[in-house]
Amino acid sequence: MSAMNTPDSIDDEARYRALCSHDARFDGRFFTAVTSTGIYCRPVCRVRTPRRENCRFFEHAAQAEQAGFRPCLRCRPELAPLQRHWSVEDARSILVQQATQWLDNPQNWPGAIEGGATVARLASRLGVSDRHLRRIFEDRLGVSPLQYLLTRKLLAAKQMLADTALPITQIALASGFASLRRFNTAFGDHYGLSPGQMRRQPLSADSQRDGTPVQLFWRPPFDVAALLRFLAERQLPGIEHVQPDAPLGLQRTARVESGGLTHTGWFSVRFDPDANRLGLQVSDSLLPVLPAVIWRVRALFDLDANPLAINSALHADFPAGDGLRVPGCFDGFELAVRAILGQQITVAAARTLAIRLTERLGEAITTPHPRLHRLFPTAQALASVSPDILGELGIVRQRQAALQSLARAVVEGGLVLNAFADAHTTTQALQALPGIGPWTAQYIAMRALRWPDAWPVGDVALIKTLGIEGRGRAAALEADRQSAAWRPWRSYAVIRAWAGTHANPILTSGVPSP
């Protein structure tokens, strides 16, 4: 196999070939720094291809910026999909991937550039010393955790400068800087321009109306329609509206908590599969938390997936599934509630219960979109509601106990349901709650925690796909054995198995209901 086709170990010559061909499959997997200009670019950049001897290659934008290169204003490295290195065996790799997940989450950014306190806080959450974290991080990525974080924040600010009409002071706060002075200093030191100079191009009329447009990119292939069909079958009226046919898109209401404040509003997405991108419009009310909204939307649509790595492990067994992604969620608590409601019933029945719950406990919201007028219930609302009310909605007692135990755990802070949470610890915590078994816990890990190696034990559709139904407990053991070759991408294997089991991929009631 040539270096170009090896997903996790391409050499510089293969990178240069990808650059010459503007290969979108490598977008975000490396950046090219040009020594003659001092600029670094994405592989898809359409400027004149630099000479090979003038190119240096970096795996992360933070590495290029540490070496003194500035981001290209044309291809805009801040728009590239994020790079993920998943492992289920290497403890150091697992530590680094957990650290980068935390640093990538904009909800952890406010005030986070205040020196070593950030590293100490992160290390404490990971259960290691800050010295050990810095050493492992620098060994694996070539930059310190603070350097990585600063690059992520500055690139987010750069995107807002280019795509929104937000005042620079608000951009500084939204990208996690404690003051405008700190922001201006960091921006100027890194990019050689002030934020005002970076925003030299006049904003379009679209950027100055409610619903700020933002571009988000992905690596192909991506079967957008399949993912939207999955979401459309489960959509909740008033909260979301999914368009699985042209024009491909989604609209939904949103709630984001950040810095002790709650922001509510709406967003709308339109997909452009030919350009490997989507257009995201966000209500003005969500602009103060725009980086967090972008981060969640990327998770919802699995935009940072690495198809080359995934397909290298799964294509032989699932050749028709190369474009399938794992549907994520915008809010982990909402996903967990809907997963519990869907236990042992059909998709349609689970959706009916979720609609009733939303109509009874969800808050009303005013938007310019007639189909969007309600927010999903908060954990506090569900934790405090009378079980009798849940019973009136048709939710049986066992599910009531599971839902309210989940809600209380989230309210008390003992349960975190996002991509930073450790998959093993969180699934164990979920299973310790009444009425939540291994299948549901793994399903939540797959979609809310964005864990690529989730494995819903005993999944009927999966066992049928593997041709081992009718063997009782032996079937689950055999499924585990066969799945070893798919690690660390078993979540994607599950999605492909569900699609391959039915004539209408991902859309029939035979697919698990949550």
Predicted regions and their residues:
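HhH-family (HhH-GPD) DNA N-glycosylase catalytic core used in base-excision repair
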Residues: 1-514
